[in-house]
Each structure stands twice: as C-alpha cells, then as structure tokens.
Amino acid sequence: MSLDRFLKNAISPWMKKDGSDADIVLSSRIRLARNMSAFTFPMLSSKEEAYAVAKHVKDALGGTQGEALGKAEMLAMEDMRTNDKRMLVEKHLISPHLAEQSKYGMVLLSGDESLSIMINEEDHIRIQSLSAGFELENCLQAANAVDDWVESHLTYAYDSQYGYLTSCPTNVGTGMRASVMIHLPALAMTRQLQRILPAINQLGLVVRGIYGEGSEALGNLFQISNQITLGKTEQDIVDDLQGVVKQLIRQERVARDSLLQHSKLELKDRVFRSYGILANSYIIDSKEATRRLSDVRLGIDLGFIENTAGKILDELMILTQPGFLQQYAKTVLTPEQRDERRAALIRERLKLEHETAD
C-alpha cells in the first residue's frame, strides 16, 4: 500500500457503504484531540520538538497497528507534493492545518480510509472516524477503539479535573468533536435556513462549510458539530447532536414534501435545468458546479432522475475540486483551465453513467 492507493479514487471505500438517512446526511465524523504529557504542545513546539514527537509516535504505533485500525499506512507530509496533500484534504482524510501548517506532520490511514490518526496537527494526535450516512454511534465506537489502542502505547496529557488537555481551550475535556455533513436543499429553497441556522448556534452547536472552520457552505451542504467539550461526556455530546440532526432531517423531509405538493413543476424544472447545464457545459466554476450538483442530487432523491446513482454526485463533489482536477490533468492549472476541465469531467462522468444504465 502506498500514497497512490489513497489518491487513485475520489470516493473512499467507506463512502460506498449505505448509512441511515443517507439521502440527507452524507457522512458522520468523530474526532478526538489528544496530546502527550512528555512533549511541548504543537502550537508552541520547535521543529526539533515536533520531529521528536513524530519519531516517538511512529516508533510506538508504526509497527503495531492493532485490530482497531486494521492494515494501515503511515504517510509523512514532508514526503508529499503540495497537490497530493490537497487531494487528501478534498477527501476529508486530513485537515487543511496538517497539510499546510504542520511541522513534521504525519497521518496513519486505515485501508478503507474510515479511520485516521493525524500527528503534529494542532494537537499531537487527532483521531478521526468517518462513516457514510447518519452513524455517529458507530463512529464513536470506532474512534474509542483506536483511542484505547493509541493510549496503550503512549501517555496522554490528562487532568483529573479538566480531562484531556488540548492546544485550544475549546477542546479541553473530552477533546471530542462530533459532526455530520448534511444536505438541506429544500430548507434552503423554502428560505427556512435563515431561521434555523441561528437557532442551531444558540444550542451550542456550530454550522460550517464542508471543509470545516473558515470554509464556505456550498451546494446546500453544511457541517454541524458540537462546540462544548468540557463538562459533558462523549455520549452526552453525541446525544445532543443526534437530537438536533434528527429534527433537521424531519424538517428537510417536510420541506421536500411541501415542494412536491405545491411547486412540483418548478422544482422539476430547476432540477432538469441543472442536469442539462452539467451535462452540456464546457466551462463551469466550482461554486456553480456545486450548486447544480445539489439540485441534481435532490432530483435523484425525489425520483425525478432515474438511472443515475446518488453516489456519483458525491464523487463529482470531490473530483471537481482543484487537487483532483490537477491530478488528472497531470499539470498545474489556472482557474480558467480548471473551469474547463471541471466541465469536461462532469460531462464525461454523466455520459458514462447514462450509457452504463442503458
């Protein structure tokens, strides 16, 4: 196994599985932040200290891997090209911080890409568990298994009063971030998001774009996560998030039913216009592509568009990002060239899907 194995396909093996409410919740994630008591935390460490952390973790974990993680591969950021790191970010396998700002950053990736351990990110160790659909409980179970395995080899920085100690005070306590990636096109079309999203923030949750903090919400895709980690158990955090997400799922389904009942013709027109643009465009920028893909995904979920799998929309969301476009072009592309390549890739992928269905 090598880096090429993780860059070969836009869709990770875990994304191909079916999860609960997958027509609305694209994925679930649990992330655990941990530090080692014997080393300076990454935000204050020197390059020499960061190197010592990387070596210590690699020596402790690299040759064992255990049942929790399965067959895995250790990848060093310094050995990777900039575009390779960008592609791993686009697949949500590593964070932008690890790719761009880490000192001697590394990642240990499981074979199916559902589990990863980032080293020398904002914290010494960040464990991530991913699952298709609304599967926070399964993600938590998998993340905890990896956490137990890591802790059996390393000594964590832990305080009996405050819990796990982290670089950012907002992560102190459980050190856990639970999140879902959710598609809310009907709530956006019916202009209910302007009311709903501020209410979610008031409940102690955070709404972001699909690449986390600082990213823009595109294509009616939102990442919703907990904000508070201190004073709550991991199960409390998951339960709180699940309660809000279940309400969002119900509201999105009601909004979809309302559109079908009162605006079916207009909705169909919007869906097929977007499909037509994607299938026939020769230039399309990232924002428009994401917006049109959102419309088409809704059309597939509502049964308007047949013989097209919803998973190819998830695939195209990743394939049309700059890193993957440049990988397939085998060269650095200008923004204008990316728009041309993006349109060509979408045209070809939709044509292939149609021919396969026939």
From Swiss-Prot:
A single BP term in Gene Ontology: phosphocreatine biosynthetic process
UniProt-listed InterPro entries: Arg_Kinase (IPR023660), ATP-guanido_PTrfase (IPR000749), ATP-guanido_PTrfase_AS (IPR022415), ATP-guanido_PTrfase_cat (IPR022414), Gln_synth/guanido_kin_cat_dom (IPR014746)
Catalytic reaction annotation: L-arginyl-[protein] + ATP = N(omega)-phospho-L-arginyl-[protein] + ADP + H(+)
Keyword match tRNA-binding: no
Disulfide bond sites: none
Residue sites binding ATP per the record: 27-31, 92, 126, 177-181, 208-213
Documented EC number(s): 2.7.14.1
Superkingdom: Bacteria
Residue stretches making up the Phosphagen kinase C-terminal domain: 24-255
Keywords, ordered alphabetically: Allosteric enzyme, ATP-binding, Kinase, Nucleotide-binding, Transferase
Activity control: Appears to be allosterically activated by the binding of pArg-containing polypeptides to the pArg-binding pocket localized in the C-terminal domain of McsB.
Annotated function: Catalyzes the specific phosphorylation of arginine residues in a large number of proteins. Is part of the bacterial stress response system. Protein arginine phosphorylation has a physiologically important role and is involved in the regulation of many critical cellular processes, such as protein homeostasis, motility, competence, and stringent and stress responses, by regulating gene expression and protein activity.
Protein family (similarity comment): Belongs to the ATP:guanido phosphotransferase family.
Identification of the protein by name: Protein-arginine kinase
Taxonomic source organism: Shouchella clausii (strain KSM-K16)
